[in-house]
A protein has these predicted regions:
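Short mixed-charge
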Residues: 57-74, 99-112, 221-222, 226-229, ...
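The feature captures the conserved acid-bearing segment of alpha/beta-hydrolase catalytic domains
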Residues: 103-180
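Alpha/beta-hydrolase-fold serine-hydrolase catalytic core, especially in secreted/extracellular enzymes
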Residues: 179-182, 188-248
């Protein structure tokens, strides 16, 4: 969020009661608490509703006289970003199908106000073949993962993290795989246990995310060329970056 703000973007952070840090704080078994929340269908739906609510509220406040957000939110240039369960949330907000759930009253998916998504540790779809699950996705997506980004709950492999990028077609995408990065490397939640407090890759991730948003939201040709060229100067030896259906 700090990197976005420093680059001139409004950055809003959304809390998800029932599936956020509160579920493991004070818990005797953080892993069990996380797993229970991850497989709770009602919490999944609540997360998607939270995303829609956050967009509603941001746009409402941007139009309200005297509000700090007044005039600061460009409704035509909104993106959503998240890590792990947050990545799952982003993927569905921009169009990934929800198997077996059908229409959710009061919730429009994909959310037509989103123009891009960023998924840190993307999540492979469950219950549908990937190409069917991702067929409705029509907005640019940046996927960031690591060579050791295995799942603690769903037994995801590092290769699974690349499935959204491999399965989505027809829209600009970028995939960054950071050498040595684990699932926890993108979280930096020391209070959740040592697995979530790995040395972070935040500087590289933040720089990639800013370049991606500049390229797809601001139509910044220099940022688009930077990513198309492998982002020299942003990545470390052993990292790799791919683009797909990229506008350069």
């Amino acid at each position: 969020g700090r990197a976005f703000a420093e680059a001139g973007f409004v950055a809003l952070h959304v809390q998800h009661p029932g599936s956020d840090a509160g579920i493991w704080q004070g818990s005797g078994n953080a892993g069990m608490a996380l797993a229970a929340a991850a497989f709770d269908v009602m919490q999944a739906v609540a997360r998607l509703r939270d995303g829609a609510f956050a967009l509603d509220e941001a746009l409402r406040r941007a139009a309200r006289p005297g509000d700090p957000l007044r005039g600061r939110v460009d409704a035509a240039r909104i993106a959503a970003a998240g890590h792990s369960y947050g990545a799952w949330t982003v993927q569905h907000l921009i169009g990934q199908r929800l198997p077996g759930l059908g229409a959710v009253p009061g919730l429009v998916l994909p959310d037509p106000r989103l123009r891009a998504g960023i998924a840190l540790s993307p999540v492979r779809p469950q219950g549908l073949p990937p190409r069917i699950a991702f067929a409705p996705v029509a907005e640019p997506l940046l996927s960031v993962t690591g060579t050791r980004d295995a799942g603690y709950i769903e037994n995801a492999t590092p290769a699974d993290r690349e499935v959204p990028f491999r399965s989505i077609s027809g829209v600009p995408q970028a995939l960054a795989v950071l050498d040595g990065a684990t699932h926890g490397a993108f979280a930096d939640e020391a209070a959740a246990g040592p697995r979530w407090a790995d040395p972070t890759y935040h500087a590289r991730t933040a720089a990639l995310c800013v370049a991606f948003l500049r390229a797809v939201l601001l139509r910044d040709a220099a940022a688009a060329r930077l990513l198309a060229g492998g982002a020299p100067g942003l990545l470390a030896p052993g990292d790799r970056l791919e683009v797909k259906d990229w506008p350069v």
